[in-house]
Amino acid sequence: MKALVYVGEKKLDFREVPNPVVNSGEQLIKVDSAGICGSDMHAYLGHDERRPAPLILGHEASGIILGGDRNGERVAINPLVTCMRCQACISGRENICSTRQIISMAPREG
């Protein structure tokens, strides 16, 4: 697939990257629209060490699910990747999951 990759301060490269691996409980989404957030700009300007180059930025997106029971469904992407097993997740407070990851921050690409 093609992606715009952050490769260093104020540097982006439009390139071919490997297709994403879809893990259990995840969906493959063909992104139709993506927003540029303030945190993406911080990374682009070199002000966020949590987003080291090279990295596919972007965590505000929408698109269409490809495959599975929900094939073709239009969705907005929740950028949080959580365990869904801890007390916070079980009680509906995934935003404070102690193992949460955010799409577009290592180790998760955007």
Task: Describe the residue ranges of each PLM region.
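Short N-terminal binding/cap micro-motifs at the start of the first secondary-structure element
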Residues: 10-14, 38-39
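Glycine-rich beta-strand-centered segment in the early N-terminal region that forms part
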Residues: 18-34, 47-90, 109-110
